[in-house]
Amino acid sequence: MPPVSKNTRTSSKTVKKPYDPPQGSSRPFFTVLKRAFSSVLHPFTSGLDEKASGTASKDRKSGRAGTKSLLTPELTPHYLGKSPRIIRVSNRSHVRTIDGIEEKVHTNTFEPRKPKQKQDYTNSPTLFKRHDELSLKSLNSLHPSSALSKKLGSTSQHQIATPKSSASLLNILRSLHDEQKNTLNISSVKQDRITEANPTCEKRKPSRSPSPMLSKKKSVARASENEPSAKQNKSFSGNDSHKSLTDIRDKENGETEVSAKNHVPHRSSRRRRRHQRLIPIIYETLEQMDLRKPVLVNAEVQTDSNPGNTMFIDKQDIYHRLSTPTSRKRQTLEKGHIKAFSAVDEDLDEIFACEDDVHYTALPKQNPKSERILEPIIASPKDNTSDKGLLTKSAPTFEELQASITPKPVKTSPNDTALTLANAEDNKTFEHQPLSKDTEAPKSQFSSSPTKESTTRKSEVEPPSPSKEIKSSHFSVPEFKFEPKTEATTDKKLNVPKFEFKPTATADVQTNRLKENEPKPTFFAQLPSKTQETPSITENKPSFFSQLSPKREETEKKDNAPSAPASTSGFSFGGFAPKTLEEKEETKAPTFNFSLNNASSTQDTTKPTLQFNFGSSFGKPTSNIFNDKKTSENGLASSTVASESKPSAPESKPSSGFGNTAGSSPFSFNLTKESKEVPPTNSFSFAKKGKDEANDSLSAKASTPFSFAKPNTENVTTTAPQFSFNFTKPNTDAKTNLLPEKTFNEEAVKQKETEKEVPPTGPKASEIKDSVSSNNAVPSSTFNFVSPFAAVSEKTNENNIPNDTTKTNGNATKRTLEQTEDAKPFAFSFGSTTEQANKKASTSNETTKPQLDTSSKTDGVTANAPFSFASAFNAPKPSTNTADGKDSASNLTTPSPAFSFGNNSGVKASSNNNPSTNSSTAPFSFGTSNKPAFSFGSATSKTTSEGTAPAASASAPAPTTSAFSFGASNSSMNKEENTPMAKDAGDTAPASGFKSGFSFGANNSPQPASMFGTSTPAPSSAFAFGNQSGTNPAAPAGFGGITNTATNNPPSTGFTFTPSNAGSTAAPMFGAGNTPNPSGSINNASQAFAFGSGEPSNPASNPPSTGFSFGAATPSAFNASASQSPAPNGIQFNLGSSNSQTNAPPGRKIAVPRSRRKR
């Protein structure tokens, strides 16, 4: 802004330089200090502060005492982007040039203001000093209650802006009561108080310019021309209050210039009286509006305006009716009442959800003139005609509005009055009503299209109103009407869909919905309960947001529910619901490629599954299990039902599902090649599986909602999902579930072989349900990226299984055994996959010990999941564990997950029978994987004799070579077999501790080269990020604190980030390297980047040249070394807080323009 402001002040005091001491004061330092403190504390101690400043300003000629708080936006530097200055704005009224500030005031105030403040009166920073036509016109037009203009004498003017906030409503209410109480002289509230309420409100003293009463006539004429816009209201109401302040003061005190000091003493008592007086008033007025009665206003999106509905409470009408001519004195009270009415304000704001941009429409039918929408207009003050298009003199007059709002019998329902809703009957309308009683609300809440009334009323559906044209579009912009809902309007029904965004439902679907008196679906953003059917989106009208219509009763579904199959929804985002029986009928419908919906689609083989389902879809097996049982409603098909379902129908599985697919549990690594189930091919299923769903999946591959690939239509060909992201909680029944085979690897091809066999549809599920065997079924990893048990062997296909396992236990066990042989490592399991791959033990025990078996099974058939991200309980150990004794899996080495990210401790309670020999190293286990090559979690894989079964034992055995262990991999591979290392951690030199290229966790493996973790043995951990208390001095702990005690070859730790107390000379790059370097002779490693306090203990012998010690490094920041006492303290990087503030540069005077607050 220009450095000089145009307004010259009457006192020609020059603006002081920012930090000059005040000239008038003898103690400049203390006064500045006091001012700073008081300005900071001002908001908190406004009452005390005001009195003091008021009295002070009396004494000081300059008026400097009334300095504005530093917190007012004009003075808050960060607000303005300027450097902080203490600016004194004197409270004395200034004679302002008309062209100077006044122009700015008007032009700026008409700019749209950000809707920061709710109360209008707080918004206007400016006072009008000119009471010429322009200012009065804008004042009158802007005053929310138009009380000013009425006081000025135009009672006939009825144009009142819709109060934008409840605050303005309250102003109107207050002014209502004021005519009687004109006698009340409430002297001005000190303007500081106003600024306190609104920091943007400028504490300008009113000017001596002639009272607005002088230009009364002009203002009245102008005001009648301007319909205030809501924004203007908001920005100006503060001005009105200031103006009225001035006039009242003039009247009361007879002073042309009144300072707030005069009335300060009694303000609090006055305010108290005012509040006591006003609270009853406001509640009276609220009662008039019936707002205090238990009327619940249904704010409903009305897709078409209902012209005849008098039930609709129009805010304008209420305001017009309530606003009666008042004295301007009440305006002065506005600021004071804020506290009294804040609660009421909020309530009102909620009732009329006021938003700046909502257009309220007046009742069109009652009042043809009021039909035009009152939009907030941002009009420049100079332009009187700017509003003309919208609100000219033709705006509804007060009488019209009053007539429109006064309760009078509605033609449609003579009984109802507009404002009375309080009876209990009406209150019921706010509850979910069973739709059996004919309520006004259309049955299908969500459709934006005009909904048919309940079947009884179909004849009465309104003829489409012009707004219905909009309805054809999928998203119609609804009008907001607040209408208390009354049941009784017989002639017309309001089409008031609740807020729902749904492509228009086809008429038949709507009618079906209407017939079934469903409770109105309320807008919920949670996973829909399973009872709700998936959003019915017809394929022809896909929409991004699908509605979840409440699920019909099974009977109804069977009767007539042609709801679009969930699979069809192209992009449904809604919660998944198991599809109803109808879908079975719809099997033909092609599924959409990308449904984000949790669509529980019972897909027939004919339907292609969604390619890209993001929701947790309870994929039903192709045979509609649900059709058989109502249990399906729950989304859980009873296993019996599952068995009932047609086993053979091949169901194409979605190639990739992101949701938990209720369908095939990717997890059934148990399946042996024998089982013919086709693992679902979801490449990427993310869905969570319901237990029943898992059964279903066994019976039929549920398409995983999120398959990335096209589902293979032929079950035979379906490959295990390449990338299943399922969050499936293991079904107890799930043993039959086929697990999506490996995701990433060729294994998918194997699975295709498996796929040939269609998963046994019904019987397996039933078996599973019957037996605990479901427990046996390894829940495929909860977040199985690829269900690790891609190993479902072809034999294990589910079709066979249903045949094999008429009794679920036997079947499951058999399958699992077979599967265990075949269990393919799941390429990418992200969830905690308890892969009890074999479940062999479970076979005999299946029902008895579902969970424990799982753990043991895990041992047996852990497919090595190349990428298990969850705690994959891969008991990599083979099937020998199997209770059956079928060791088919045993021959398998359980592959360790290549990338297990989770807690990959084979949870098997029993140690794997097969010892480390089978344990494969997971190249990348991110969780605790037993000897994972890559464990990212705490891998306590102790391969003692159990083989790689991740014994939960925390003992740090011989480290497996986890290339990437990111967790604490306590993999003490005791077994000589796999690990060259001696299992005891004491062994300093376990042969090649597993060289964990990247161990990020506490790697207690005796000598893992734990790159990132604390590797106790000193492996050459390029990147040890944790405490590496490796006894082996040679182990370079790259990133962790190396406590290499050995002085000899300290690991050259490229990057130790933690305090490395290594006796070794390791130069901890980033940590506090207290390398005591016992042999002082050893050159301390030059730590390029010590970020901690690096105090090399023996500074004398080559102190490490810490290039960049960022901590409290005894050799301070850039010292070459402590030894060089003259060492140049290199660059001083004081990054901490320096409290020194430099003075502003002497030359610059930053004049803060008075008008800047209007920005």
From Swiss-Prot:
The name on file for this protein is Nucleoporin nup124
Family from the record? To yeast nucleoporins NUP1 and NUP2.
Q: Which organism is it from?
A: Schizosaccharomyces pombe (strain 972 / ATCC 24843)
Low complexity composition bias: which ranges?
A: 642-656, 863-879, 909-926, 948-963
Instruction: Identify the keywords attached in UniProt to this record, alphabetized.
Output: mRNA transport, Nuclear pore complex, Nucleus, Phosphoprotein, Protein transport, Repeat, Translocation, Transport
Q: Name one GO molecular function term.
A: nuclear localization sequence binding
Q: Does the keyword Phosphoprotein apply?
A: yes
Give a short account of what the protein does.
Nucleoporins may be involved in both binding and translocation of the proteins during nucleocytoplasmic transport. In S.pombe it is required for the nuclear localization of retrotransposon tf1.
Detail the disulphide connectivity of this chain as listed in its UniProt entry. Answer: none
Residue positions, PTM Phosphoserine: 211, 380, 465, 546
Q: Which Pfam families match?
A: Nup_retrotrp_bd
- List the biased-composition ranges (Polar residues): 1-13, 226-239, 442-453, 528-549, 590-626, 657-672, 696-715, 771-780, 798-814, 830-861, 880-908, 927-947, 1001-1019, 1042-1064, 1074-1087, 1095-1108, 1116-1144
Per UniProt, the ranges with Basic residues bias are: 263-273
Composition bias, Basic and acidic residues:
48-62, 106-119, 240-260, 426-441, 480-494, 550-560, 746-758, 815-824
Cellular compartment(s): Nucleus, Nuclear pore complex
